[in-house]
A protein has these predicted regions:
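Short beta-strand segments
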Residues: 86, 117, 142-148, 174
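Phosphate/pyrophosphate-binding loops at sites that engage ATP/ADP/AMP, CoA/4′-phosphopantetheine
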Residues: 65-80, 224-238
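Conserved catalytic cysteine-centered active-site region
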Residues: 42-44, 48-60, 88-141
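A structural motif shared across PLP-dependent enzymes of the aminotransferase-like
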Residues: 29-31, 36, 89-100, 248
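Conserved small/polar residues in nucleotide/adenosyl-binding loops
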Residues: 246-253
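Flexible, glycine-rich active-site loops centered on histidine and acidic residues
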Residues: 137-166
Length: 253
């Protein structure tokens, strides 16, 4: 363990990468397999299309996104100290998705590589872990990836869930930086309104209480934004973008 530092470092995003499967599933496509239509989906979610894997999986998407992020950075892969993959749909119990990414990218064998699972908040938790690693190690760069193949845990007869999710991956290469991004605030969560028992379980599909999720978003979103602005000594006029994970256009608007 390292001796503690007086100054906590933040993080800076160096580059990004993404990967999407080829197949596009439109709202009209879904209307042919479940009781729904384009107007119903668009009005309630704002979603027009989503992507679905046919030949790829969580791991291959993660590798592609990671490779794109590394290529865009111009960073020597020998300087990458860790790989963290946030996923709830890993293809293997082990080895981890991150370990496979490490191998496929040709990273050093002593690179720290592990997965974490925290559903919708997984990538944000990966950012927090990455920041913590910068403050406890000599790592120069860390590769963070969010990758999901949600299609393998969706019930395509359940219109409350199958319209919301798709497959894809995103990656960022981060480095330590003073006076940059850091965690400011957490809000509360719930363990009952969005559930997936797991691949291999008797009921392995995603189940969601949509009304409860909607009420949660409406009730908590403004409160959370107000708290963050207060802690940052900022106002809403200072903000250019707000990035939300949403299940309805109403909280977004």
């Amino acid at each position: 363990y390292r001796q503690g530092r007086d100054k906590v470092k933040g993080i800076q995003i160096v580059s990004t990468g993404k990967a999407l499967p080829e197949e596009i599933i439109t709202n009209d496509d879904l209307s042919r397999i479940v009781d729904t239509n384009d107007e119903w989906i668009t009005t309630r979610t704002g979603i027009k299309k989503r992507y679905r894997c046919t030949q790829e999986n969580t791991t291959s998407l993660a590798v592609r996104a990671a490779y794109e992020a590394v290529e865009a950075s111009g960073v020597d892969i020998a300087e990458i100290g860790a790989v963290i993959v946030a996923t709830s749909t890993a293809d293997n119990a082990f080895p981890s998705t991150a370990a496979i990414v490490q191998k496929e990218l040709g990273l050093a064998e002593n690179v720290l590589a592990f997965d974490l699972s925290s559903a919708c908040t997984g990538f944000l938790h990966a950012l927090n872990v990455g920041q913590a690693l910068f403050n406890s190690t000599d790592y120069k760069y860390i590769l963070l990836i969010g990758s999901e193949q949600m299609s393998k845990i969706l019930d395509y007869t359940d219109r409350s869930t199958c319209v919301l999710f798709g497959d894809g991956a995103g990656a960022v290469l981060i480095k330590a930086a003073d006076n940059m991004y850091r965690q400011i605030n957490y809000t509360r969560g719930d363990t009952d309104v969005l559930v997936c028992r797991g691949i291999g379980a008797q009921d392995a599909y995603v189940k969601m209480n949509g009304n409860a999720v909607f009420r949660f978003a409406v009730d908590v979103l403004k409160q959370g934004i107000d708290e963050i602005l207060k802690k940052s000594d900022m106002t809403l006029d200072d903000i250019d973008y707000i990035c939300l994970l949403y299940t309805s256009p109403s909280p977004r608007d």
